[in-house]
């Protein structure tokens, strides 16, 4: 797989749909720095296999989404980039490692990043080794990643939920109705405690019925 360093048109560079980090955040300061000093560190991109109507190759950004956004805001037409051919697995590994090292990700973004690698066949042990995390850490994120989109859509602020809140949501994996109710709750902690009580009461009731059935 060849690697080159080139100056590429910003219009030929596209955000990676598999980037764990979904928002670039505030880029005003970075844009100001780029206007005065230029881009000091090249982006890392990979060809996406497409061309525009003029025949120019198109690329996916692997590292440098914030720099690209700031370059566009600064009015730059080209940016320096390292171009590397890579497969989907390597792309995801690089993006996840890069973002976790910078502590940029929200807990759910990080969880979805690990899930993306799992979908490509990367095991928990290998993910832990590549990101410098423990197996327990990775498994915890993967459990969070299983929270379905329907539940996530219950709250406009879902992406900002804390790790503790996401853990509590994941506890209701086997009860989608309760999970959705908790996701949309205005008072998350109070609702969590109430749902836990309801679940314990239901479990006690079911157990009592089972024992009565055995007695007969």
Identify the residue ranges that each predicted region occupies.
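Amphipathic heptad-repeat coiled-coil/leucine-zipper-like oligomerization helices
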Residues: 206-209
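Alpha-helical interaction elements
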Residues: 101-177
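Short, ordered loop/turn segments at secondary-structure junctions
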Residues: 48, 84-87, 132-133, 143
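Conserved small/polar residues in nucleotide/adenosyl-binding loops
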Residues: 215-216
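Short, charged/polar connector segments at secondary-structure boundaries
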Residues: 1-84, 95, 100-103, 180-181
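Amphipathic alpha-helical transducer elements in NTP-driven molecular machines
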Residues: 24-27, 65, 89, 108-111, ...
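Extended amphipathic alpha-helical segments with heptad-repeat/coiled-coil character used for oligomerization
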Residues: 160-163, 168-198, 202
